[in-house]
Swiss-Prot record:
Entry keyword set: Repressor, Ribonucleoprotein, Ribosomal protein, RNA-binding, rRNA-binding, Translation regulation, tRNA-binding
Family listed: Belongs to the universal ribosomal protein uL1 family.
Organism of this sequence: Shouchella clausii (strain KSM-K16) (Alkalihalobacillus clausii)
Record has Ribosomal protein as a keyword: yes
Record's GO cellular component terms: large ribosomal subunit
Record's protein name: Large ribosomal subunit protein uL1
Keyword flag rRNA-binding: yes
Length: 231
């Protein structure tokens, strides 16, 4: 434990907590300050100038990162007939109806994302109490309630990530692994920030992007300058 503590302390010395770095430099620091023995996930945290309590300032959606997240998502699809066949052909890990609903009710959660066709939502809706708290409930805003199951599955497998503002106005999104080259992390980072600007609520007043930070799973948070993104 002492050795790990020293590594973390040494990593902290590389970061000036009072400095907001350019995005590329911040991401390079994330890689340098990674001290874990596993390939840590790199996450971006954005503080937005919105009031999530107001319906017209809630932000939720999904975007395909150009270089993915470094993690293969296990996709479960609720569909029947031809749509079930399409989901299987697209690479879904699990496809079914009541059989999968029963498994989930019994405590099975060996999947990361759920896609459902609209005609299945009445049945899937019964899982709300189980899926809701885990953030697994399919939603049209994230493209996971759709008849185009082929596109949905392929995008998720290609690196689609969901984003959602929390009660404090923050959004946390994974943008890759510390093993990624900095340019790839930077492109994923820019994709997230650009996407958040595209979905800026008309009702949001004042500074929109208030704060940005990046960090690895076990590493320190590193501030990113918002000069280019604040408006």
């Amino acid at each position: 434990m002492a050795k790990k503590g020293k590594k973390y302390a040494d990593a902290l010395k590389l970061v000036d907590r009072d400095t907001a770095y350019q995005a590329e430099e911040a991401l390079e620091l994330v890689k340098k300050t990674s001290v874990a023995k596993f390939d840590e996930t790199v996450e971006v945290a954005v503080r937005l100038g919105v009031d999530p309590k107001k319906a017209d300032q809630q932000i939720r959606g999904a975007v395909v990162l150009p270089h993915g997240t470094g993690k293969t998502q296990r996709v479960l699809v609720f569909a029947k007939g031809e749509k079930a066949k399409e989901a299987e052909a697209a690479g879904a890990d699990y496809v079914g109806e009541d059989d999968l609903i029963n498994k989930i009710n019994q405590g099975w959660f060996d999947f990361d994302v759920i896609v459902a066709t609209p005609d299945m939502m009445a049945q899937v809706g019964r899982l709300g109490r189980v899926l809701g708290p885990k953030g697994l409930m399919p939603n049209p805003k994230t493209g996971t309630v759709t008849f185009d199951v082929t596109k949905a599955v392929e995008e998720i497998k290609a690196g689609k990530v969901e984003y959602r503002v929390d009660k404090s106005g923050n959004i946390h999104v994974p943008i890759g692994k510390v093993s990624f080259d900095t340019p790839k992390l930077l492109e994923n980072f820019q994709t997230i920030v650009e996407t958040l600007h595209k979905v800026k609520p008309a009702a949001a007043k004042g500074t929109y992007v208030k704060n940005i930070a990046v960090a690895s799973t076990m590493g320190p948070g590193i501030r990113v300058t918002t000069t280019a993104f604040a408006k």
